[in-house]
Amino acid sequence: MRFLIVMLAYLGAMGLARADTLAVDTGRGVRAWTTTELLSRPDARDIRVPGDVSYHATRTYRAVPMKALLPGVPADAHLQFTARDGFAAEIPASLIIDGHGAHAWLAVEPDGAAWPPLGAGKPSAGPFYLVWIDPDKGPVGPEQWPYQIATIKVLPDPAKRFPAMRPDPRLGADAAPVRGFAVFQRHCMTCHTLNGQGDAKLGPDLNIPHSPTEYLRADMFRTLVRNPQNLRRWPQSKMPGFDTHVLSDRDLDDLEAYLKHMAGRKVQP
C-alpha cells in the first residue's frame, strides 16, 4: 500500500511538471521549455506591463522576449498560440519579430508563486502568458494576449489552411468581404470556426447551420459584437465586447459584409 501511495504521488508530480511545460514548434522540430528553464534564461527579466488586458491593471512579470524563442522563424510566417481551454490565437510572426514598437514577452509564472486568479473560481493566467509593452504601436488587439498557453506552432496562413473560410476569389482585394475576412482572422477565429473549419473550440460556428447575420437584425448584430451581454446573458458567457478602440466601425461593417457574403457560401463539414 505504501508503494502504491508513493507511486501515485510521483505520477501526480510528473503530471504537474508536464502541465508547466511549453511546447514550441517552429517547423523544424519541437522544443519543450519548462518553467525552470525559461526563468533561468539569461535574457529573462522583470518587466512592468501597464494596462494588462487580462488583469485590467498594471502588472509586473518575470518574462522572456518572445522572439528569442522563435529562432529562424521568418517575419512572414504565422503563429498559433493554443491555450489549455482550446482558445487559439492566430498572430502574424511579423508582429512579434518586428512589432514596429510593440514588444512581445512571454511571462512565466514561477513555481510556488502563483499569480492571482483571473476571477472568482478561475485559475491564473499562467503558467505562460503572452504580454505586450507598447501594444498600441503594433497595433495589438486583446485577442493577441493569449494566456494559459500550452503550445506555440508555426503554421501556414489561415487562408491556406482553411479554404472554406475564404470569400469568393473573384472579389477584389479591397472588397468589403475580403477586408472583413482579415477582421475575422484577427478577432473572431480565436474562438469561432466557420464552415466547420478552424482550430478554436470555444464559440459556435459562425456559418453552420446559420450565420448570425441571417437571424439578427443589423442593429442586433452590432450589439452582439459591441456589448454581447446586452443581447444575451448567461453565467458561462465568455465573449468580450469589442469597442471602437479595438474594432473600428469600418472594421465592423467589413466583418458584417464578410459574414453576409459567407452565408451564401456554406460548406457542410
Question: Which residues does each predicted region cover?
Answer:
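Axial heme c-ligation environment in periplasmic c-type cytochrome domains
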Residues: 91, 201-207, 227-256, 262, ...
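Structured, non-membrane catalytic/scaffold regions adjacent to prosthetic-group chemistry
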Residues: 20-156, 269
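Bacterial N-terminal signal peptides
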Residues: 5-13
